[in-house]
Swiss-Prot record:
Family: Belongs to the bacterial ribosomal protein bS16 family.
InterPro entries: Ribosomal_bS16, Ribosomal_bS16_CS, Ribosomal_bS16_dom_sf
Record-level Gene Ontology MF annotations: structural constituent of ribosome
Domain of life, per lineage: Bacteria
Organism: Bacillus subtilis (strain 168)
HAMAP family named in the record: Ribosomal_bS16 (MF_00385)
Protein name: Small ribosomal subunit protein bS16
Keyword Hydrolase: no
Amino acid sequence: MAVKIRLKRMGAKKSPFYRIVVADSRSPRDGRFIETVGTYNPVAKPAEVKIDEELALKWLQTGAKPSDTVRNLFSSQGIMEKFHNAKQGK
């Protein structure tokens, strides 16, 4: 089972709000998911990002692949750097 960390769209029309979820890559964007890792609100100024760092690192270490947008959000929070350091044994 290929697992991805991606955004699930929530909120009203023209007012998106996203949950960062771990889901099977074959399930639809807003369909079934395994676990919620955090939230992302691009409408708020500045954009509001809340991520459970321990959960995100756990899923990255078990092989979940983040989408491009989630990778950028993780990088801005410093999670990708911690993941790469842990992977290389630093």
